[in-house]
């Protein structure tokens, strides 16, 4: 029998990572496209309706992402159990995930329902405030469905089955457009709800996607041995919930801190004028789109690293981490090159104002530089989640974003302490600095974990399963 060389192993691992991450990427694109469709279709009603979607999303997203972050403890846990021939324990994790939803949904729902307290103090027009509040209240009915969808998606992702979520999200996107048309503009005898109609349509889509994901999970042949639905309602298990919260809470806080960083940046730039905010938003939108590539790769890395560790193969987990890092940097090289070459054309997609295009193009140069650090920190972060080392991600993220990034950005952007105030350029320089430091620290953390003896590492992971 011919022995497989290291190079052949790397090729196999690279293929596995790409095949696993592509459906995740397409699902992310479809999910983000729903928000884009909502904005465009609401904008055809009025500027106030479009603005309501934007303001509502700025409140909705951090809260929902927190709930989603808690459930992201499931993929590394499930992939580890799957790899270690402990599939009989997977159903228990999924059922306890439902308890995580039940515990988190009450405070999240209350915050969304009473968001009028914040909105009414933002100083916006009364008409806009009322549309935003009604939009969020409509979205609220879809919150349980969305979190249940994430719970069962995490099960499938942990089993390295990423295609179902891709197909279901694409179906959701296709349904979102006609449902928006009916509820926004008032068709088929339904009243015209404007932006609120987007909330109604999204709620319906979330419930449909949730039902489809649960139906797939229940009928999939490769999951019948798990018996997830035999006793779907089980009592909360304090030990399991503690382990899942211990893994998920740092992820949830880290996600929210990142969302909050960019939201606060936009607010701090607002006094500098429309052009500054617009150019920053162009660079941020471009960055968010490109970010889906390393993020998908990072999620695939979590799954395969967790599975390899479950198979008691730390060497394979290490190899997967470095192969993923190579793919991430290779992808960043391509996207950074395209960003630099096409920076004026990219800015021109968003606006026609030459001054805004020029400023946005200069920010996109910094954005191109930032992509390398971003790729490293996202992929290495994915590997660390596979090692179930989520606290390190939280501490490093908080330090780099809030102790380094925000103060440096504010000083360079808004003050003359170091140089003449640089406007949005100052914040983008800070992003490059903070992400580079984060990438170095996260990589060092991964290196330290991988230096542990196999026995020491596997014993620790067994305690966390």
UniProtKB/Swiss-Prot annotation:
It is found in: Cell inner membrane. It holds the Pfam family MatE. The keyword Protein biosynthesis does not apply. One of its GO terms (molecular function) is xenobiotic transmembrane transporter activity. It is a multi-pass membrane protein. Signal peptide: none annotated. The chain crosses the membrane at residues 50-72, 92-114, 127-149, 164-186, 193-215, 248-270, 283-305, 320-342, 393-412, 422-444. It comes from the Bacteria. The keyword Cytoplasm does not apply. One of its GO terms (biological process) is monoatomic ion transport. One of its GO terms (cellular component) is plasma membrane. Keywords: Antiport, Cell inner membrane, Cell membrane, Ion transport, Membrane, Transmembrane, Transmembrane helix, Transport. Its main location: membrane. Belongs to the multi antimicrobial extrusion (MATE) (TC 2.A.66.1) family. Multidrug efflux pump. This is Probable multidrug resistance protein NorM. It comes from Mannheimia succiniciproducens (strain KCTC 0769BP / MBEL55E).
């Amino acid at each position: 029998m011919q022995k497989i060389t290291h190079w052949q192993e790397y090729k196999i691992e690279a293929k596995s990572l790409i095949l696993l991450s592509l459906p995740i990427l397409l699902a992310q694109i479809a999910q983000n496209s729903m928000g884009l469709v909502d904005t465009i279709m609401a904008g055809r009603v009025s500027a106030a309706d479009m603005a309501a979607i934007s303001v509502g999303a700025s409140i909705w997203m951090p809260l929902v992402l927190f709930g989603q972050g808690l459930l992201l403890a499931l993929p590394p846990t499930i992939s580890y159990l799957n790899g270690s021939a402990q599939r009989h324990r997977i159903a228990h994790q999924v059922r306890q995930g439902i308890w995580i939803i039940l515990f988190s949904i009450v405070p999240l729902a209350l915050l969304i329902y009473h968001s009028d307290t914040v909105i009414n103090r933002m100083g916006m027009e009364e008409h806009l405030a009322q549309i935003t509040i009604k939009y969020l209240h409509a979205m609220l009915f879809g919150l349980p469905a969305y979190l249940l969808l994430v719970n069962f998606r995490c099960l499938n992702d942990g089993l390295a089955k990423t295609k179902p979520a891709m197909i279901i999200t694409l179906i959701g996107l296709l349904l979102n457009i006609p449902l928006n048309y009916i509820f926004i503009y008032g068709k088929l005898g339904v009243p015209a709800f404007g932006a609120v109609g987007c909330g109604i349509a999204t709620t319906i889509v979330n419930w449909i996607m949730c039902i489809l994901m649960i139906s797939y999970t229940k009928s999939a042949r490769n999951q019948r041995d798990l018996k997830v639905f035999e006793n779907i309602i089980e009592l909360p298990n304090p030990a399991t919930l503690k382990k899942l919260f211990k893994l998920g809470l740092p992820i949830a806080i880290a996600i929210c801190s990142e969302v909050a960083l960019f939201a606060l940046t936009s607010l701090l730039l607002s006094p500098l004028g429309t052009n500054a905010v617009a150019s920053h938003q162009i660079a941020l939108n471009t960055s968010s789109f490109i970010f889906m590539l390393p993020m998908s790769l990072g999620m695939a890395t979590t799954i395969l690293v967790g599975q390899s560790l479950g198979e008691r193969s730390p060497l394979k987990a290490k190899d997967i981490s470095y192969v993923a890092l190579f793919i991430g940097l290779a992808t960043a090289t391509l996207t950074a090159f395209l960003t630099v070459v096409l920076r004026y054309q990219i800015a021109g997609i968003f606006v026609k104002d030459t001054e805004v295009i020029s400023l946005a193009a200069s920010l996109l140069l910094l954005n191109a530089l930032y992509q390398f650090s971003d790729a490293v920190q996202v992929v290495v972060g994915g590997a660390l989640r596979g090692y179930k080392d989520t606290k390190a991600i939280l501490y490093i993220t908080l330090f780099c974003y809030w102790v380094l990034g925000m103060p440096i950005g504010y000083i360079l952007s808004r003050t003359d302490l170091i140089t003449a105030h640089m406007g949005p350029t100052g914040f983008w320089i800070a992003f490059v600095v903070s992400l580079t430091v984060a990438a170095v620290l996260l990589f060092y953390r991964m290196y330290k974990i991988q230096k542990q003896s196999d026995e020491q590492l596997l014993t620790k992971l067994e305690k966390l399963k």
